[in-house]
Regions:
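A short alpha-helical cap/connector motif
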Residues: 1-149, 153-193
């Protein structure tokens, strides 16, 4: 596997999105995003020391710092259910938000704006939550948003829940599996209607 510039940035910030730490997302993200004019990023699921502290030298907001460095002109937003995940830094702003609460999701979009270029769902990883969040937030975001759901174990279940959307599972190497060697670290790209 080729180590991309984004892989190196991800490793530097200790996010689990890079192959050297956990997932093989950053090589795919690099190819997908390297030529895109990304100005606004919103990631749901920031991570806390309780959930990510097993990664040596982990810092809260690791992936937000990765996006901030990779997109030097972008405003980066993060949202999480835990108050322990809140950080503020240059071009990074975080908000409390429960991905299963429609009103909180609407308030989040009111705060960050609907003109998000890249949205990543890295929150609870529960299929029902992933479907609910996509169905709730996609109509509030601009049509050409790049919407990615991470840590997908059963993409067919999510696709059924999002039947009105065009969903695509890109081919990436896998490092984590459910029983019967079914990958549980897939990505799902959802195209807004």
């Amino acid at each position: 596997m080729v180590e991309t510039p984004l892989c190196k940035i991800a490793y530097k910030h200790k996010t689990d999105k890079c192959p050297r730490i956990k997932h093989c997302y950053t090589p795919f993200y690099y190819e997908l995003l390297k030529d895109k004019p990304i100005k606004r990023v919103l990631e749901m699921g920031i991570g806390t020391m309780e959930t990510m502290g097993h990664i040596p030298n982990y810092k809260i907001g690791a992936s937000l710092y990765m996006w901030q460095e990779f997109f030097p002109e972008a405003q980066v937003f993060g949202a999480d259910i835990s108050p322990n995940a809140m950080i503020d830094d240059k071009r990074i702003k975080t908000y409390l938000c429960d991905e299963t609460d429609e009103e909180q999701i609407k308030q989040l979009v009111n705060k960050v704006g609907s003109d998000v270029d890249l949205f990543i769902d890295d929150a609870s990883h529960f299929v029902s939550h992933q479907i609910f969040l996509a169905k709730t937030i996609l109509p509030l975001l601009k049509k050409d948003v790049i919407y990615i759901i991470e840590d997908v174990g059963m993409p067919d279940h999510i696709k059924k829940g999002l039947i009105d959307y065009d969903c695509h599972v890109p081919r990436i190497p896998h490092k984590r599996y459910l029983r019967n060697r079914i990958p549980k670290d897939r990505l799902l790209i959802v195209k807004n209607k």
